[in-house]
Regions:
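Residue-level marker of positions within ordered structural domains that often coincide
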Residues: 19-20, 84, 128, 150
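Short, T/G/N/S-enriched strand-turn elements that build extracellular solenoid repeat scaffolds
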Residues: 91-169, 173-204
C-alpha cells in the first residue's frame, strides 16, 4: 500500500503490476491451480488473484525449483522473460502491415494500419501510439484489444474487422474507438466493451 520508487520490487508486486496493465480478467482465473509450485503459501493475499491470472494466462512458469518465489526481488532478466512470455511481436515503425501474427501483438508507435490479417491472441495498442491513428482494416483478433494509446484521431475498426473484447484504459487523455459505417450491428453483436475507471472514451 506504499510507493517506494527507489526500492526493488518483489516478484509478486511485478506480477500484480503487469496483470493490471494487461487488464487480465481475475474472475476468469479464480480456479487456476498453483499446486505445481512449491511454497505457494508465501503469496500474499492481495497478490494471489493477480498471480493466478498470470499463471493461468501462461505468462509465469516459475523457476527451475518449481517456485514462484513471490517475495524475492525480481531481476531485470526475470522481468524481461515475463514480457517475452507475454508479447510475441512488436510493431515499432509506422506503416501498413499485412502478415498474420501468432500470439500477442504490441503496437508501440503511431500511424499504423493493419490490413487483411489475423492476430491469434491479444492486440495491445501501447502508450507509444500516443495521439496517433491506428487502423484495423479487415482484421480478426481472436483475443482482446487493449487500448492504452491512440487519441481522438482514433482507433478505427474498418471493413468487417472482427473483435470480441475491447478494453479502453488510456489514462493520460481521451481515446476514441470508431467502427466504420459499413459495419453492421450484427457483425459486432457479441462485442464486449470495457472502459476502465480512470480512462476516458468518446463515441463518434
Amino acid at each position: 500500500s506504499t510507493m517506494d520508487p527507489d526500492e526493488p520490487i518483489t516478484r509478486q508486486e511485478a506480477m500484480t503490476v503487469v496483470a493490471r496493465a494487461l487488464q487480465l480478467n481475475l474472475e476468469d482465473h479464480e480456479e487456476t491451480s498453483l499446486s505445481q509450485f512449491r511454497a505457494r503459501a508465501d503469496i500474499s493475499a492481495w497478490a494471489l488473484p493477480y498471480v493466478r491470472a498470470m499463471v493461468g494466462s501462461d505468462y509465469i512458469h516459475g523457476n527451475e525449483k518449481r517456485e514462484l518465489a513471490p517475495r524475492d526481488n525480481i531481476t531485470r532478466a526475470e522481468f524481461s522473460q515475463i514480457f517475452h512470455n507475454i508479447i510475441q511481436e512488436y510493431l515499432l515503425t509506422s506503416g501498413t502491415y499485412t502478415q498474420d501474427y501468432a500470439g500477442n501483438l504490441l503496437i508501440r508507435t503511431d500511424d499504423v494500419t493493419l490490413r487483411d490479417l489475423t492476430i491469434d491472441g491479444d492486440l495491445i495498442i501501447g502508450c507509444g501510439a500516443a495521439d496517433g491513428t491506428i487502423t484495423l482494416d479487415n482484421v480478426t483478433v481472436t483475443g482482446r484489444i487493449v487500448v492504452w494509446g491512440g487519441g481522438t484521431d482514433a482507433v478505427w475498426m474498418n471493413n468487417g474487422t472482427d473483435v470480441e473484447d475491447l478494453i479502453v484504459c488510456r489514462v493520460d487523455g481521451p481515446a476514441k474507438v470508431i467502427f466504420d459505417k459499413d459495419s453492421t450491428l450484427a457483425v459486432y453483436q457479441d462485442i464486449e466493451v470495457t472502459v476502465t475507471d480512470r480512462a476516458e472514451a468518446f463515441p463518434e
